[in-house]
Amino acid sequence: MKICIISFDYWNYDHHIVKKLQEKGIDASHINMGAYKYKNFGERASNAISKIFLNKNIKHVKRQEYVVNTLKKLGPQDQILVLNPHTLDYQTIKEIKSYTPYLISYLYDNLERFPIEEKLELFNKIYSFEDKDVKKYGFEKITNYNYLSENPIQAEEIENDLFYITSYDKRRIKLLRKLTVRLSALEVRSKIVVVGKQVWKEKLKQLSSSKLFSKYIQLRKTPIYIDEVLDEYKKNKVILDLMRDGQEGLSFRVFEAMAFEKKLITDNPSILNYDFYDPQNILYIANDLELLNESFFDTPYKRIPTELFRKYTLDNWLNKVFGLEQTLNEKKITLYSS
């Protein structure tokens, strides 16, 4: 079986899908749009001029060409999965569809943030982690996945009580300002990192605002590699998870916390409806930061049952999205019949 994954793998999550498929003996490939680079300085300068004067992003066009040209080299696929297809034009997706009888999409952002309504008709199956989009458009519900092993290596020493890394987002920044006051009152040792090109705005605000925010929050323009993030998780008791505006689906932090057996603090109310929710492990704070107290940090993590843990693994996710168990069973029946 040949399966191709097409995505803009910014945080390097999607390559785990390909790796796990290959471990299952499937001929899997990954077309990562984020891997496309300018050929030279002239191409970069040309794109900058085009964006300013023609309102046209040549790099966006080149990425589409990169996807199609790579797919031509790979040839026909049994299944193709496109993650968050807002980065692809209608015609590009239509051409991708010509290479497979079964085109799938997984949306791990809501359609309010990245509208793609006009492209939905091109897909044979669409999965989404957002309940409201599932209800409105008839998508199939699926969560993000735990891509880590069942027994990941833990740190020898815990350095902090709480860790959080996030891309720059106005809503999150607003909540973090309130949160730093509470963390300070509780004397919680924490490391919070905000990443993005827009962090300069916060750096300007810090010149005239409370020093408490700058004491607790690190602002940086360049991203932190996922391996570094995972190392930080190991060295902390609790992982913080704050939603984007309009988000209901569970972020990867939830499943990373599950894998490392770390407690979780979140403002996402949908987590209360999941079968793995346990108030000893997960603190839902909503708008009431008074719920954040020392006892949550002091009590140990309560290990969830193995069967429940495996329900949210990448292995189980792949079986559902690509129908792998059904395919393998059909192969067994064919071999038995012959």
Task: Kindly give the residue locations of the regions a language model identified.
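Nucleotide-sugar donor-binding catalytic core of glycosyltransferases
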Residues: K2-E23, D27-F53, K62, N84-T87, ...
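Short N-terminal targeting/anchoring amphipathic segment
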Residues: I5-I6, N69-T87, I104
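A short, well-structured beta->alpha microelement
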Residues: K56-L71
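Active-site proximal beta-strand in glycosyltransferases
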Residues: L81-N84, I96-N110, Y127
